[in-house]
Amino acid sequence: MSDPRERIPPGNSGEETIGKAFEWLNRTVEEINRAAVNHLPRELIFQVWRRSWEYWHDEMGMSESYTKYRYLCLIQKALFVHCKKGCRCLGEEHGAGGWRTGPPPPPPPGLA
């Protein structure tokens, strides 16, 4: 009787796949940030980035990749809701938001 379990295709070892996943995550975070500034206030993007690091990484002790993944999910959801409500941005950038005092938080990747 033959083994019914699926076999790993050649060239797809765990190490290669994991490395590609991290590259994909970093690249996707940068790309979504470049797109998000055309639809969301920069201040909002920066605050979500900062708060994601404070909560998921610092408070919960999660890895950098998990923190970036959670941030990515939040920004994707924000863009989805924005577009669902009827985006009329047409590529114009929004201002800083103007609703927070003090120095701005450090920018997320792709917006530095």
From Swiss-Prot:
Keywords: Host nucleus, Host-virus interaction, Inhibition of host innate immune response by virus, Viral immunoevasion, Virion. It comes from the Viruses. Transmembrane segments: none annotated. A motif (Nuclear localization signal) lies at residues 65-72. Belongs to the lentivirus VPX protein family. InterPro entries: Lentiviral_Vpx_assoc_factor, RetroV_VpR/X. Residues 102-112 have a biased composition (Pro residues). One of its GO terms (biological process) is symbiont-mediated suppression of host innate immune response. It comes from Simian immunodeficiency virus (isolate F236/smH4) (SIV-sm). Its main location: virion. This is Protein Vpx. Pfam families: VPR. Residues 93-112 are annotated as: Disordered. Interacts with the P6 region of unprocessed GAG. Interacts with host VPRBP/DCAF1, leading to change substrate specificity of the CUL4A-DDB1 E3 ligase complex. One of its GO terms (cellular component) is virion component. Plays a role in nuclear translocation of the viral pre-integration complex (PIC), thus is required for the virus to infect non-dividing cells. Targets specific host proteins for degradation by the 26S proteasome. Acts by associating with the cellular CUL4A-DDB1 E3 ligase complex through direct interaction with host VPRPB/DCAF-1. This change in the E3 ligase substrate specificity results in the degradation of host SAMHD1. In turn, SAMHD1 depletion allows viral replication in host myeloid cells by preventing SAMHD1-mediated hydrolysis of intracellular dNTPs necessary for reverse transcription. The lineage of its organism: Viruses, Riboviria, Pararnavirae, Artverviricota, Revtraviricetes. The gene is vpx. The keyword Thylakoid does not apply. It is found in: Virion; Host nucleus. Gene3D superfamilies: 1.20.5.4730.
